From Swiss-Prot:
GO cellular component: ribonucleoprotein complex; ribosome
InterPro entries the record matches: Ribosomal_bL35 (IPR001706), Ribosomal_bL35-like (IPR021137), Ribosomal_bL35_sf (IPR037229)
UniProt protein name: Large ribosomal subunit protein bL35
NCBIfam families in UniProt: rpmI_bact
Presence of keyword Ribonucleoprotein: yes
Homology family: Belongs to the bacterial ribosomal protein bL35 family.
Taxonomic source organism: Bdellovibrio bacteriovorus (strain ATCC 15356 / DSM 50701 / NCIMB 9529 / HD100)
Pfam families: Ribosomal_L35p
GO molecular function: structural constituent of ribosome
Keywords, comma-separated and alphabetical: Ribonucleoprotein, Ribosomal protein
Segments of this protein annotated with the region Disordered: 1-45
Skewed-composition ranges (Basic residues): 1-43
GO biological process: translation
């Protein structure tokens, strides 16, 4: 069986030249009127995949 890149992962994640994996923060689509401006500002920034999850991400992004 062929190894394939996970379609959902390739749409949501980007591997940087340093080896880190960039991702968009969640919880910013809707139902955020009750959130403080500080929370919304922090969630708007990009974040990185934690080291504990890197093995699973590397398996999804084989190519």
């Amino acid at each position: 069986m062929k190894m394939r890149t996970h379609s959902g992962a390739k749409k949501r994640l980007k591997v940087l030249s340093s080896g880190k994996v960039k991702k968009k923060s969640t919880r910013m689509r809707h139902l955020n009127s009750h959130m403080s401006s500080k929370t919304k500002r922090q969630l708007g920034k990009t974040s990185y995949v934690e080291d504990a999850n890197m093995l699973q991400v590397r398996r999804c992004l084989v190519f």
